[in-house]
């Protein structure tokens, strides 16, 4: 089995693959203060709850945008799974030309998403990932990574609003009954949901105008289904796109 780990600034997503089949997946908080023992015990508990045997893990692949956690995660893998992990980074065989001014600047998660999306759809694409930051990654019809856009994430916007406007509460990110809110909570939700949908659709329209081929827009991340349900541009949702990309890159670099 393959253990795939996607370390984001806010959450870490873990998946266990048996061949090409995603057997189980979990989302946990990314913590800078956990020791490798604490991460190891947490994963052992998750495996036990799913009836999975840690000894069956034959390889580990990690994409991380949190460099300080690299040593901790490596030690966790060695001590609790007896496996040295493969980290996504420069020099890895991606099968995708990275047409960025400095390819080393492209986050591991963005490369992984691009590889997974092109492997599945084989066309011009925009991948929108709703994480701590909302990222837009553009892939040409020939399978080249062209670049993209980075925006503040939904959670960051919610936190900033609640912190900076003392009379406005932090609300659940949920679709309101109408874009015209009838109370404070619904008004904030309308601004967040429809504001982000407007941003996504607007950026995707601008990207499409610059490309020779109209792109398919794919969304991933925990909030992708909600946004996609309102967006006019998003046509596909794959919440496990990053994990699938990790599996593909592991296969290409074994």
From Swiss-Prot:
Annotated compartments: Cytoplasm
GO annotation, cellular component aspect: cytoplasm
Uppermost EC category: transferase
Pathway annotation: Cofactor biosynthesis; coenzyme A biosynthesis; CoA from (R)-pantothenate: step 1/5
EC number: 2.7.1.33
Binding locations of ATP: 6-13, 132
Active site (catalytic residues): 109 (proton acceptor)
Subunit structure of this chain's protein: Homodimer.
Task performed by this protein: Catalyzes the phosphorylation of pantothenate (Pan), the first step in CoA biosynthesis.
Protein name: Type III pantothenate kinase
Gene it is expressed from: coaX
